[in-house]
Amino acid sequence: MNTELQPKLEKSAVNFQAKPRKQKIRKDPNAPFIREKLELPDGHNKLLLHSCCAPCSGEVMEAILASGIEFTIYFYNPNIHPLKEYLIRKEENIRFAKKFGIPFIDADYDRQNWFDRAKGMEWEPERGIRCTMCFDMRFEKAAEYAHKHGFPVFTSCLGISRWKDMNQINGCGHRAAEKYDDVIYWDYNWRKEGGSQRMIEISKRERFYQQEYCGCVYSLRDSNKWREETGRQKIEIGKLYYSAD
């Protein structure tokens, strides 16, 4: 069952100054971060943002806020395993949304459905067909919610991570939106203009939980296998957070 958190908008000390696209991003991390002004497709000004976690969505949220776009966060990620990891990632995302008064849609943790769809793909590599299935599943729900609740545009913060295949993600987003005449998928490149680096800076500033694998049980398995082979300690759920230094 979906629930909405619509906390009162609070003022923030963060510099959300937006500038025209021709302006360059300043390189000094201690200087005010000057952004390009974003525009939604077809002149729309209402957006549904599918979010996977606070670190990936932090820069995306601040960029959207800087441009004065009305948006709501949609958290639907049944792939995340185990439940403890899922809850930590969700609560971190809620914490950041509350800071700026952003509505947050907490969608169902439809874990069994995800496992059913993943059958036969348990040993597929990262960025393979299992990941396509996972993006399809999440974006199908996001597009459906956008259609039912009057959001003409939806997008996702998934593509900001350099661990992901942006073309794969965008293909899934467009495929989900094609089912509805009144929904557009916005395939904005969140990595450009220093977006990926800014993502890390915000994560450190906010001291977000630092997840060490993509999210699903198979990603956790493969990450721990690599760690074992390279003499590293296995992942401990809920332990690692970004530090300011």
From Swiss-Prot:
Pathway: tRNA modification; tRNA-queuosine biosynthesis
The keyword Disulfide bond is assigned to this record: yes
Superkingdom of the source species: Bacteria
Reactions catalysed according to its record: epoxyqueuosine(34) in tRNA + AH2 = queuosine(34) in tRNA + A + H2O
Keyword Metal-binding annotated: yes
Database matches in InterPro entries: QueH
GO biological process, one term: queuosine biosynthetic process
EC numbers: 1.17.99.6
Matches recorded under Pfam families: QueH (PF02677)
Record keywords, A-Z: 4Fe-4S, Disulfide bond, Iron, Iron-sulfur, Metal-binding, Oxidoreductase, Queuosine biosynthesis, Redox-active center, tRNA processing
Record GO terms (molecular function): 4 iron, 4 sulfur cluster binding; epoxyqueuosine reductase activity; metal ion binding
Annotated disulfide bonds: 214-216
Enzyme class label: oxidoreductase
UniProt-annotated binding residues for [4Fe-4S] cluster: 52-53, 131, 134
UniProt function note: Catalyzes the conversion of epoxyqueuosine (oQ) to queuosine (Q), which is a hypermodified base found in the wobble positions of tRNA(Asp), tRNA(Asn), tRNA(His) and tRNA(Tyr).
Similarity remark: Belongs to the QueH family.
Protein name per the record: Epoxyqueuosine reductase QueH
